[in-house]
């Protein structure tokens, strides 16, 4: 049984990373920014898994678990900041975060 070629998996990971990067740079809503970060982290995790599967090493899967753990921590902290931003300024615009000083 053969899997997908490594080039296809890495191309998919690169496309997902670029989509996340564009979403990160274009959007001003903090919720969409967090979602774009998650897409980028999942793309990196996919690249680790594809590379690990190519050489038959479990290191890619271990890195995937670490990336998922990091993504969960990032999401929880980001959502906590999002809630505080919305409660204080009644908006999800990232430009309002500059007013949080003081």
Swiss-Prot record:
One of its GO terms (molecular function) is NADH:ubiquinone reductase (non-electrogenic) activity. The keyword Cell inner membrane applies. Signal peptide: none annotated. It is a multi-pass membrane protein. It holds the Pfam family Oxidored_q2. Keywords: Cell inner membrane, Cell membrane, Membrane, NAD, Quinone, Translocase, Transmembrane, Transmembrane helix, Transport, Ubiquinone. Disulfide bonds: none annotated. Its EC number is 7.1.1.-. The chain crosses the membrane at residues 6-26, 30-50, 62-82. One of its GO terms (cellular component) is plasma membrane. One of its GO terms (biological process) is ATP synthesis coupled electron transport. It comes from the Bacteria. It is an enzyme of class 7 (translocase). It catalyses: a quinone + NADH + 5 H(+)(in) = a quinol + NAD(+) + 4 H(+)(out). Its main location: membrane. It is found in: Cell inner membrane. NCBIfam families: PRK05715.1-1, PRK05715.1-2. NDH-1 shuttles electrons from NADH, via FMN and iron-sulfur (Fe-S) centers, to quinones in the respiratory chain. The immediate electron acceptor for the enzyme in this species is believed to be ubiquinone. Couples the redox reaction to proton translocation (for every two electrons transferred, four hydrogen ions are translocated across the cytoplasmic membrane), and thus conserves the redox energy in a proton gradient. NDH-1 is composed of 13 different subunits. Subunits NuoA, H, J, K, L, M, N constitute the membrane sector of the complex. Belongs to the complex I subunit 4L family. This is NADH-quinone oxidoreductase subunit K. The lineage of its organism: Bacteria, Pseudomonadati, Pseudomonadota, Gammaproteobacteria, Pseudomonadales. The gene is nuoK.
